[in-house]
Each structure stands twice: as structure tokens, then as C-alpha cells.
Amino acid sequence: MKTAREIIENYDGPDVRIMEVCGTHTHEIFRLGIRKLLPKQVELISGPGCPVCVTPVSFIDEAIYLALEKGVTICTFGDLVRVPGTNMSLAGAREQGAKIHIVYSPADAEKYAGEHPDEQVTFLSVGFETTTPAGCLSVKAAREDGLDNYSILVANKTMPQAYEALKDSADVFLYPGHVNAITGTRLCEALTEEGVSGVVAGFTAKELMTALAVALVKFQEGKPFFVNCYPRVVTQDGSREAQLLVDEMMEACDCEWRGLGVIPKSGMKLRQEWQEFDARLKYQMPKIEGKPNPACRCGDVLQGKCKPSDCKVFGKGCTPQHPIGACMVSGEGACSAYYQYS
């Protein structure tokens, strides 16, 4: 029986484009040297699986508006601080007097609000199915603690709608293991009926190699497929507890993705009974239209239309020290991975 490495190195089938949906997969594939094993007819492209990267410019502008115009203390993950908005980043806003507090979880933000009752505190809630439950729990805790100074600015997204929107960009999706651990595999299985093929992958060298080998073998059969190559963590049903929590507190809404535009029913928002914690409603926020830097091709990278190295400012005007786009800022960003490992 051939090993996964032998299957990959000796692949002699048709050209195939495999999209790494997850930014962690992109970094690990680079770090482990897996790209060097691929024959020329196998192309790995990056996708929209970095939550910071797909967060639109308008969201950064909204956060800056809250901080500078409303005097709100912004609690955020560190990756978001240096992402450029239309005119500045959150780091730039901090230089102008904004209160930007870095936290490691929504629970930290809720705790901060409880310890600082004289401050209005908003947590920037970004991410996919893996992080949405934690944001919900922080809102529940705020209600239980009687906090009226805590809210969340929601930009949480769901992945299946993005897969469908990008189905013509790749032949096979390398599905993120941690997302499917929450959602289960049923949604991805159902996408095969739409012609979408994919494999769920873990994050070790063995797990990634196995998933890629399975993808190449199944692709040659010529019909849509789904295989769970991460069964020790991912089940068909996923985490029912997390799903029920999110369903109790949030509902689907149309959502803007950087580079992909508005994808129907791909976002989340707080249900009516929790809307006193919705920062957009609490502060009667006006509609803000963000304008990305025209030199940045982050949107094309996220759609698999180009590689980071195809961007004219990659490694020149745009570096991790001086990023123009979100894909260079985030630790999960494709541009960051290419810059670090190329």
C-alpha cells in the first residue's frame, strides 16, 4: 500500500486546484515543507479561512467610530489592532487617544467591563463557528452580572456559504478541522450535491498529508466527494451544545466578506431578545462604507484569484511591519505565510 507521501509525489492525474480554507493550514503546510512535495499539476491556493482577513474595512472603521466618536473602550484580539481601516488602524486610533484594550477571549472583555463600570466597553466579535459560542457566553455573563456597559460589535461568519460562493475557484476544499468540530460534517456532505468536493483535515504533518493524498485519489474518480480525514476530533453531528447556544442567541444575516462582497445568510447577529448588547443598535451607528487601499489585493488572495507574491506591493510596500492589507497582518493570513516562508 502506498504511503500518503508516495501518493502525493507520484500523482499523475489531471490538474487540480486545492484551496486551503484555513489560515492555520496554509502556515502549517508551508512550515512542514509539504508544498515542496507537490507535482506541478497540483496547485495549492489560499482561501477565506482567516477571520481577521475576511473582516471588511468597514468593520475596522465602525470600531474606530465607537472609540473616537463615542468614547467607547474597545476590547479586541491583538491581530485586529494593526489591520488598516479606511483612514487608520485601531493602533492609529489609539495614538489619537482611543482606548484600545487587547484581550485573549470575550470573557476577558466582559470581566474588564465589570471591573470598569465607568467605561462603556465593546468587544470586537470576529471569527467563524469556532469563536462565536464564546462571544455568546460573554453576553450571557454580562446579563447575569447585570452589566449595562458591555456590548459586542458582531462580525462573526459561517463557512458553508463561503464554500458555495467559491465553488468555481477550486476543485477541492481542504476544510478546517476546528470549524467542523463545532458544525459537524453534515453541511459539507450536503455540498457535494452542489458539486463541491472537500476533505476535512487536521493540523499535524500526518493529518495534512493524509487529507491531501485522499483528495488526490478521490479527485481522479471524477465525481464530487466528501471525506472526513480528521475523525478523532470531527464527528457528523459536531458540538450540539455549542450549536444550541448560538442558535438560542444569534440568527443568520447577510454579511460582507473582504474580497467576496456580501454573501447572503453568511453572518450572525444577536436575536431581538439580546439586542441591548448589540453595539450597532446601542450606539445608533450610522452606515459606514469602508474603502480598502486600491493597491491591496487581499480580496483576490482570499478568493484564490492570485497568490500573495502576485501582488505588486507584496514584500515591498506591504510587510508585516508595515501592512497594507489584513492578510499581511494576521498570524493566519496567507500573505504573512508567504512572506515568512517563501
Annotated model-derived regions:
Residues 18-20, 101, 122-125, 151, ...:
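Short catalytic-loop micro-motif centered on adjacent basic/acidic residues
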Residues 151, 168-232:
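A conserved active-site cap/scaffold subdomain adjacent to cofactor or substrate pockets
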Residues 124, 128-187:
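Phosphate/pyrophosphate-binding betaalpha-module
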Residues 210-300:
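Internal helical hairpin/lid segments
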Residues 61, 136, 140, 160-161, ...:
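Residues on a specific face of well-ordered alpha-helices
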Residues 1-118, 132, 140, 144-145, ...:
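Metallocofactor- and cofactor-centric catalytic cores in central/energy metabolism, strongly enriched
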Residues 17-18, 150, 221-231, 257, ...:
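Flexible, glycine/charged-enriched surface loops at secondary-structure junctions
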Residues 25, 128-130, 156-160, 177-180, ...:
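Glycine-rich beta-alpha junction loops
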